[in-house]
């Protein structure tokens, strides 16, 4: 009689995952069209990232500035949350940027750089800004 251990047959079964519908509403994370964007900085004035939006594709997102490291990533969560909250309230993407400008507070850990609202030809341009050293 062999004492060889056999693997549990359940370990060889395929797992079935059924995608559940629903979840919170989200703006599309991509667009091929032009985007409006805001520059976001920390208290010291160091750029931590960019919030962008395009109404035609119902798209918006947050691009963290890679050179900002973990600190920029952590501070950027606040701005990504603002976009998620705006979408949940049915706010158009560029209107969400306008809210960010209105609610920005220079005394917080990060803020919209005054006068930074700009337009870019595409999302790739903003991603390029975020990837600069």
Task: Please state what every model-predicted region is.
Residues 25-32:
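Short, exposed beta-strand/loop patches in secreted or surface proteins that constitute
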């Amino acid at each position: 009689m062999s004492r060889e251990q056999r693997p549990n047959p359940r370990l060889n079964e395929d797992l079935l995952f059924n995608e559940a519908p629903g979840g919170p509403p989200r703006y599309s994370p991509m667009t091929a069209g032009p985007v409006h964007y805001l520059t976001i900085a920390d208290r010291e004035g160091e750029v931590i990232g960019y919030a962008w939006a395009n109404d035609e594709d119902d798209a918006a997102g947050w691009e963290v500035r890679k050179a900002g490291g973990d600190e920029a990533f952590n501070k950027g969560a606040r701005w990504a949350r603002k976009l998620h909250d705006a979408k949940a309230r049915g706010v158009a993407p560029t209107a969400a940027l306008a809210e960010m400008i209105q609610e920005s507070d220079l005394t917080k850990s990060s803020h919209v750089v005054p006068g930074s609202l700009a337009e870019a030809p595409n999302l790739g341009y903003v991603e390029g800004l975020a990837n600069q050293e």
